[in-house]
Amino acid sequence: LYLAMSLHLDTPRWAAWTVLTVSVPSLDHAFVKSFYRMIGTIVGAAAGIVIVALFAQRPLVFDLAMALWAGACAFVGTRVRQYQSYALALTWLTSGIVSYGSVADPNGAFIVAASRTAEVALGILCAGGAAILFDGHRVATLVHAASPVPGQARRNGVRAGLAVMLASAFWYVSQWQDGPFFVLMSGAAALLFAAHPSKVAATLGMLRGFLLGTLLGLFVRFALFTRSASFGEETLVLLPFLMLGGIGLADSRTQGPATGYNLAFMLAADPANTLSFDLGGALNEAMAMIFGVLVSIGAFLGLVPIRDLLHRDGA
């Protein structure tokens, strides 16, 4: 966070969130996860630039392209190994950050992509350095995701694509100012747990983490931060809340809620060189996060079970 702010990167919170997401107890796992996160970020940034360049002037085609891309990432992510699946989720998330962040100004897509890639790379380097300094043990064999049952990858692709399409339709009709962020969160939640054996439970856990992270992040931003806060003061305020998220990630039983908590907390607290105290904007962004996760839960609960009733063989 200090380096991101010193380098005057646009959104230091993404660098801090990257550290939290790639930090795992084992040095081996940390390096592998960081590698796949970097690959996912680079591919996602490139895909985001291409999608904006091709479809930014055609909103409906743009929404369809993002939905198909989400479905493709979820489909492939279900069929590959654990950290490769994670990379696919981050690929779409980065594509969404670039695409939705620059669709109103397509000429700025490359700048957005470069900024996000730099922030993620900085976070990975910091997490890697910390892993080397404080590594407790090494693990020779990585954990692999269970092989998907026949048809599971296809169903997960449908889930993710339809979640993005439903959110996009609401954004298109309502013209909600934070609609792009709402769509981004709906797709991200659907993809992060696409290959999870208990998708609904995992996503509900993430939602609980989102709620807690949002509340604590807003509390920090509007009650504890001051307009003249130095980096040292911001660090002292943030430290106990970041430690809470890190402890949650270290326990497999709380990784889902901790993932949601860390993302929501960093987005809501929004630490930066120039702090923003726009309460209305912060509440709108918080609503977009929470409703986005609810859309993905609806996709898990409602969209595929109907299909399963018609095709009991799982195909």
Positions of predicted regions on the chain:
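A transmembrane helix-and-boundary motif of multi-pass membrane transporters/channels
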Residues: 1-315
